[in-house]
UniProtKB/Swiss-Prot annotation:
Changing M595T: In DUH1; uncertain significance. Changing S513R: In DUH1; uncertain significance. Interacts with GNAS. Interacts with IQGAP1. Interacts with TRAF6 (via C-terminus); the interaction is LPS-dependent. Interacts with MAP3K7, CHUK and IKBKB. Residues 852-860 are annotated as: Required for interaction with TRAF6. The keyword Repeat applies. The gene is SASH1. Residues 622-631 have a biased composition (Basic residues). It is found in: Cytoplasm. This is SAM and SH3 domain-containing protein 1. GO terms for molecular function: G-protein alpha-subunit binding; mitogen-activated protein kinase kinase kinase binding; molecular adaptor activity; protein kinase binding.
Length: 1247
């Protein structure tokens, strides 16, 4: 269609005549195919002509139009058209004979090359038709035909070397290449290679082009032979030689004309007109030639048919399978136009336009012909064809004027270059050449009827081009710039095939820019660096970056639009801005027109319409999200942080002592607080917790809870208890949002000022439990702290702060709070330790040792503290005596109950009473009260011990707790707990652990130390039930024994608190229990248990020398491969549910990997964590076997004892294991049972 438009404008007519010369080369390469092609082409021509004739009128009309257009005599135009037609016929004949007359072919190709389009000009219409045909088959009837004609030239050169092959191909392609052999000539191949080299087309495209040409040529050859029988080819052959020379002259003329044309083309409009004039001048001869061809042979008949507008189509269809598509387009063309020549001219013009249009989608209305032709071909080789067609046409025009493509067969090279972008660049190049030539020629005949249409098209196109020229040309020019002027547009067209929009908008424009650009660029292979690129550019401009929707490169910032801006419809590069849009800035040129990505479109925008977002402003998104989850944004300054934790009174102290920024502040340690004379234990705990959270946030800024933990923790700390609110599950609580509610509930329920302050802070982000805990814990903690005099300072810290901390912790992350509590506890006296006893560790450890225990106390808080307590528990367990453990247990229970919820506070207190009564006598019973189901120490203990029981108890404990306290307490606790994620968040667990280590647990300790300790135990009871499974020591044994057991089991993990203690806080069972409990309780429990359990697990792993960051526990990608046997053993040793142990082990593993800056892929769930059981086939050593059964710490022991090979494993005995130094009965049993089982697989593996 564009061709038509282009032809109409004027440049096209010239190109059309020029295409005629190409036919000559076409004959050169493939005389017979030329004949067959001629016939096929004549059919195509007929179709085209029919279309053109039908819609555009007859040849006479076209000639008249040309005459009018060129201000020349009608008879001259007719003569010229006749000449062209004759030439074309002779060329067709020659095409048949060119094989026979290489000289003429060479001459033609040389002339064509020299003229660029000469060949096309002199080429008879038949040849034009052939190219058209090819074009159709490839690109579209007309578009491809034209460009094929151009290409034909090129191809002819190629075909010279590969005539036979080319012929076959030619037949398939029919005209553009039919003239030459199906195989490309060397020149054509060179062109293709050049195109590939210049990245105009890919190698694949070039190969595809070759194949397509061959296939089409073969078909065409088949057709041609059929045609030859008609005699059309022989006739052509006869006149072919003469025509060949004639063509040479004509080509020379045309080349001159085309050069002029090219210059004109450079000025798009003038070029067009001149092209048309040239076309007219050439066309008359072309038409004459074509008529001759028709007369001469059936091909002529076909041509006549073309003129008639019907005959050719059938032939075409019959002629070549590939042509049918062309035919379809042809038939479309044919029916509209009665004058085949006119049609052809129109077609050519259209082809030209069409090449563009075709490439783009044949949608341009002005290029109706092009569209018709284009569709069939378009489908076939829309991309290549179009790019070639358009590019080639443009190039052809440029080439003709430049004669630059001469080297490669006239247009072919240029076209090819242009079409390099397209897959079949050579064919396209030829076709493009043909298109141009045809356009040039056809305008002559086609000008008559086409003339009017062409004129209108021209005018329309001109207007469009002039309008769009700025935008489209700029786009296309950008394309042209990217590619040599015209080629880019042509290629864009191909690419735009799918985007008719661009084509329509820029088809003529493209032609023009192509022509103008091509005139200068045409010679340049139009390396068109990549028409595709330019296409893309233009497409982008026009279609809004369809090509590269999302820009994936680096951005140099972001900007928020503050003023709406709607760009001009002609400004395709500018982004449409709406207030509030966020633009990702790609570049900020100093001129002020920045480039950015908005709504998946890359474009430009003026910096004055936007406000650049600073990094901080951009980050709010995350914090906002977190806030939505109930997490406050990270504090931005020390002042902000102190304000959040309600300790602004210390601001001057920090600022005057060099703590001006958070980076310095997060290095704050307890000794520094002493130096700064900050003595208030609560304040110290809060500050240390805030520091921990800051550090955590930095190391783990992305882990959901850290930031919030910091804020919440800080807030909670400022509120009430320092760090004890280890209940907070940063990740889970935040995630579920239940935590928030829980904290709110707690805040509501807690009436204590400290609790209120804490809850106030906590409400926002922490679970209720922490709040309640903090209230209760504060009250109880204060009381208990008083009770534990020595502990008092720290205890109050531990106690009150624990409550607060717990809350904070729940909000932020239990571990931090707990850790601080532990640290604080460490500082605090025994009593302090006791409150921490909340944690299993605390319970186990003596009051003095209980410093850590408090951490455990914190841990008991189901929410998050549990995890921390576990850690604390580990350390405190060692330290604390069983007695203390029981006391701690009570304290823990108390603390936990407080933490669980303020409503629970009452409950906790009641529980405390009962637990204190029974629990004081027996710590285990207190744990049981946790379970509530079994208030009796024994019963409670048992419950705590069983993981399932623990879970049930956890639930029950919640219920129990509340029953002990009040329904309100229960409800509150349940509410709070549901708010807390049922499972402890992995991060929180880690954090808990760390916090425990830091001594965050002190909070619970204070409360547990005092009578309220029963209260604390209540909470611990909850936790205890879950806890009991957590710690191996938390065996269902007697309550009294439990502490011992706890210590004993604790001993292995050294940090493990006494059994009952473990049960209470440490018990992952709490976690487990938390899971089973309500969502809220589960979460709380899981948090508390998680903290405890994580600490216990980590300490146990450390004691056993198991490095989870190494194989087989973690592979090089950070995936988990913890053997199930190890998880099972730890679950037994820690008396915790396997699920919790597995989750904690994975958290530990991930944390350790991250500390090593290694990739860490957390695994989800027990099955995934243990999904890599060591298969017997993988066991190659005793060490591997021990790892597979979860007892890797005995590798050295067994090796020392002489068991160094797998063959010795089956012979292991109880005695030899004891002699080797393995004293743990369960481990010995495991080893023996595994050794017995190993007898089967070991055979091969035994070493």
């Amino acid at each position: 269609m564009e061709d038509a438009g282009a032809a109409g404008p004027g440049p096209e007519p010239e190109p059309e005549p020029e295409p005629e010369p190409e036919p000559a080369p076409e004959p050169e390469p493939e005389p017979k195919p030329g004949a067959g092609t001629s016939e096929a082409f004549s059919r195509l021509w007929t179709d085209v002509m029919g279309i053109l004739d039908g819609s555009l009128g007859n040849i006479d009309d076209l000639a008249q139009q040309y005459a009018d257009y060129y201000n020349t005599c009608f008879s001259d135009v007719c003569e010229r058209m006749e000449e062209l037609r004759k030439r074309r016929v002779s060329q067709d004949l020659e095409v048949e004979k060119p094989d026979a007359s290489p000289t003429s072919l060479q001459l033609r190709s040389q002339i064509e090359e020299s003229l660029g389009f000469c060949s096309a000009v002199s080429t008879p219409e038949v040849e034009r038709k052939n190219p058209l045909h090819k074009s159709n088959s490839e690109d579209s009837s007309v578009g491809k035909g034209d460009w094929k004609k151009k290409n034909k030239y090129f191809w002819q050169n190629f075909r010279k070397n590969q005539k036979g092959i080319m012929r076959q191909t030619s037949k398939g392609e029919d005209v553009g290449y039919v003239a030459s052999e199906i195989t490309m000539s060397d020149e054509e191949r060179i062109q293709l290679m050049m195109m590939v080299k210049e990245k105009m087309i890919t190698i694949e495209e070039a190969l595809a082009r070759l194949k397509e040409y061959e296939a089409q040529h073969r078909q065409s050859a088949a057709l041609d032979p059929a045609d030859w029988p008609d005699g059309s080819y022989p006739t052509f052959d006869g006149s072919s030689n003469c025509n060949s020379r004639e063509q040479s002259d004509d080509e020379t003329e045309e080349s001159v004309k085309f050069k002029r044309l090219h210059k004109l083309v450079n000025s798009t409009r003038r070029v067009r007109k001149k092209l048309i004039r040239v076309e007219e001048m050439k066309k008359p001869s072309t038409e004459g030639g074509e008529e001759h061809v028709f007369e001469n042979s059936p091909v002529l008949d076909e041509r006549s048919a073309l003129y008639s507008g019907v005959h050719k189509k059938p032939l075409f269809f019959d002629g070549s399978p590939e042509k049918p598509p062309e035919d379809d387009s042809d038939s479309l063309t044919t029916s509209p136009s009665s004058s085949s020549l006119d049609t052809w001219g129109a077609g050519r013009k259209l082809v030209k336009t069409f090449s563009k249009g075709e490439s783009r989608g044949l949608i341009k209305p002005p290029k109706k012909m092009g569209t018709f032709f284009s569709y069939p071909e378009e489908e076939k080789a829309q991309k290549v064809s179009r790019s070639l067609t358009e590019g080639e046409m443009k190039k052809g025009l440029g080439s003709l004027s430049h004669g630059r493509t001469c080297s490669f067969g006239g247009f072919d090279l240029t076209n090819r270059s242009l079409h390099v972008g397209s897959n079949n660049s050579d064919p396209m190049g030829k076709e493009g050449d043909f298109v141009y030539k045809e356009v040039i020629k056809s305008p002559t005949a086609s000008r008559i009827s086409l003339g009017k249409k062409v004129k209108s098209v021209k005018e329309t196109m001109r207007k469009r081009m002039s309008k769009k020229y700025s935008s489209s040309v700029s786009e296309q020019d950008s394309g042209l710039d990217g590619m040599p002027g015209s080629p880019p547009p042509s290629q864009p067209d191909p690419e735009h095939l799918d985007k008719p929009k661009l084509k329509a908008g820029g088809s003529v424009e493209s032609l023009r820019s192509s022509l103008s650009g091509q005139s200068s660029m045409s010679g340049q292979t139009v390396s068109t660096t990549d028409s595709s690129t330019s296409n893309r550019e233009s497409v982008k401009s026009e279609d809004g970056d369809d090509e590269e929707p999302p820009y994936r490169g680096p951005f140099c910032g972001r900007a928020r639009v503050h003023t709406d801006f709607t760009p001009s419809p002609y400004d395709t590069d500018s982004l449409k801005l709406k207030k509030g849009d966020i633009i990702d800035i790609i570049s900020k040129p100093p001129m002020g027109t920045w480039m950015g990505l908005l709504n998946n479109k890359v474009g430009t925008f003026k910096f004055i319409y936007v406000d650049v977002l600073s990094e901080d402003e951009e980050k709010p998104k995350r914090p906002t999200r977190r806030r939505r989850k109930g997490r406050p944004p990270q504090p931005k300054s020390v002042e902000d942080l102190l304000d959040r934790i309600n300790l602004k009174e210390h601001m001057p102290t920090f600022l005057f002592n060099g703590y001006e920024d958070l980076d310095t502040f997060k290095l704050l340690e307890e000794e520094d607080l002493d130096e700064l004379n900050i003595r208030d234990p609560e304040h110290r705990a809060v500050l240390l917790t805030a520091v921990e959270l800051l550090q955590e946030y930095d190391s783990n800024s992305d882990q959901s809870g850290s930031q919030e933990k910091l804020l919440v923790d800080s807030q909670g700390l400022s509120g009430c208890s320092p760090r004890d609110s280890g209940c907070y599950e940063s990740s889970e609580n935040l995630e579920n949002g239940k935590t928030r509610k829980a904290s709110l509930l707690s805040a509501k329920s807690s009436t204590e000022p400290s609790l209120k302050s804490f809850s106030r802070n906590q409400l926002g982000n922490y679970p209720t439990l922490p709040l309640m805990k903090s209230g209760d814990a504060l009250k109880q903690g204060q009381e208990e702290g008083r009770l534990g005099g020595g502990l008092a300072p720290d205890t109050s810290k531990s106690c009150d702060p624990p409550g607060v901390t717990g809350l904070n912790k729940n909000r932020r992350s239990l571990p931090v709070s707990i850790c601080r509590s532990c640290e604080t506890l460490e500082g605090p006296q025994t009593v302090d330790t006791w409150p921490r006893s909340h944690s299993l560790d605390d319970l186990q450890v003596e009051p003095g040792a209980e410093q850590d225990v408090p951490t455990e106390v914190t841990e008991p808080p189901p929410q998050i503290v549990p995890e921390v307590p576990q850690k604390t528990t580990a350390s405190s367990t060692k330290a604390q005596p069983l007695e203390q453990d029981s006391a701690v247990d009570n304290a823990l229970l108390l603390t936990q109950s407080k933490r669980f919820s303020e409503p629970q506070k009452l409950t906790t207190k009641k529980l405390e009473g009962s637990i204190a009564a029974s629990g004081r006598g027996l710590s285990p019973p207190q744990c049981l009260p946790r379970n509530y189901d079994a208030q009796p120490p024994g019963a409670k203990h048992g419950l705590a011990r069983t993981p399932l029981e623990g879970h049930r108890k956890g639930h029950e404990f919640e219920g129990t707790h509340h029953p002990l306290g009040t329904k309100e307490g229960v409800d509150a606790e349940q509410r709070m707990q549901p708010k807390i994620p049922s499972q402890p968040p992995p991060v929180p667990a880690k954090k808990s652990r760390e916090r425990l280590a830091n001594g965050l647990h002190p909070v619970p300790m204070g409360p547990s130390g005092a009578l309220p300790s029963p209260d604390a135990p209540c909470l611990p009871v909850k936790r205890g039930s879950p806890a009991s499974p957590t710690s191996p020591s938390d065996c269902p044994p007697a309550l009294a024994p439990r502490p011992l057991s706890g210590q004993a089991p604790g001993s292995p993990p050294s940090t493990r608190p006494p059994p009952w203690l473990s049960e209470l806080p440490e018990n992952t069972s709490l976690q487990e229990h938390g899971v089973k409990l309500g969502p809220a309780l589960t979460r709380k429990v899981s948090c508390a248990r998680g903290v405890d359990l994580e600490t216990l697990t980590e300490n146990k792993l450390h004691a056993e020398g198991i490095d989870l960051t190494e194989e087989p526990y973690s592979d090089k990608h950070g995936r988990c491969g913890i053997p199930e046997a190890l998880v099972q053993r730890y679950a037994e040793d820690l008396d915790q549910p396997e699920r919790d142990v597995a989750a904690n082990m994975d958290q530990i593993r991930v944390k350790q990997l991250r500390k090593q800056h290694r990739m860490a892929i957390p695994s989800g769930g027990l099955t995934e964590i243990c999904r890599k059981p060591v298969s017997p086939g993988c066991i190659s050593s005793v060490s591997d076997w021990l790892i597979s059964i979860g007892l890797p710490m005995y590798a050295g022991t067994l090796s020392t004892a002489g068991f160094s090979t797998l063959s010795q494993v089956p012979s292991l005995s109880h005695t030899c294991l004891q002699e080797a130094g393995i004293t743990e009965e369960r481990h010995i049993r495991k080893l023996l049972s595994a050794a017995r089982l190993f007898k089967l697989p070991p055979g091969p593996e035994a070493m």
